[in-house]
Design a protein with these regions (language model features):
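Positively charged n-region of N-terminal signal peptides that target proteins for export
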Residues: 1-4
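C-terminal motif of bacterial Sec signal peptides marking the signal peptidase cleavage site
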Residues: 12-15
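Bacterial signal peptide processing site
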Residues: 17-20
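Transition segment at domain starts
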Residues: 22-78
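Noncatalytic modules at the cell exterior or secretory-pathway interfaces
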Residues: 85-89, 125-143
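Extended, low-complexity, turn-rich repeat/linker tracts enriched in Gly/Pro/Ser/Thr and Asp/Glu
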Residues: 92-100, 141-144
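Short, surface-exposed beta-strand/strand-loop-strand elements in extracellular ectodomains
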Residues: 95-112, 150-151
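Edge beta-strands of jelly-roll/beta-sandwich modules across compartments, strongly enriched
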Residues: 138-154
Length: 154
């Protein structure tokens, strides 16, 4: 009887852990379980290393997020488009400090830019040519978090 109770307790605990891991994406996610066959992502990268001891981040196939405390410097992800596409983005930035949020193409041309000193959530679409892009967050004494997700339009 004790073994059965222990097995039930272990199964219940495993279910709780699974729920926690699955909930890690973001409760405000707009583009859950999308298929982006023409967009490949990599990252997170840093221009000069992580200058924030409390920095944490995670990434998925169509999203990235980070939390930070007194961050200064540039973090970025890479997106590679195998063909020209219209891409929908959902950005949710919670902020104290300054962040320049931008998307640049392989020629270092800025295709999207937001200079932020306050929190901002927005949806936007970009017509992007085939090629490589960097999504950058240039921060100065910033505390907060960012969440970005994307999907290709059909």
């Amino acid at each position: 009887m004790k073994k059965i109770a222990l097995i039930i307790a272990m199964i219940s605990l495993q279910s709780c852990i699974t729920v926690k891991v699955n909930a890690d994406v973001d409760s405000n996610s707009f583009y859950r379980k999308v298929d982006n066959p023409n967009i490949k992502s990599q990252g997170t990268f840093f221009d000069k290393g992580v200058g924030d001891s409390k920095w944490s981040n995670s990434n998925g196939d169509n999203w990235t997020k980070a939390k930070f405390d007194d961050a200064s410097g540039t973090s970025y992800i890479k997106l590679k488009l195998s063909k020209s596409l219209t891409v929908s983005f959902h950005s949710d930035i919670h902020l104290k400090g300054d962040i320049n949020f931008e998307i640049v193409d392989q020629n270092n041309e800025v295709v999207f830019n937001r200079q932020l000193t306050n929190s901002k959530e927005e949806n936007f679409k970009l017509d992007l040519a085939k090629g490589d892009y960097q999504v950058r967050w240039n921060s100065t004494n910033a505390t907060g978090s960012y969440f970005l997700e994307w999907k290709e339009e059909k």
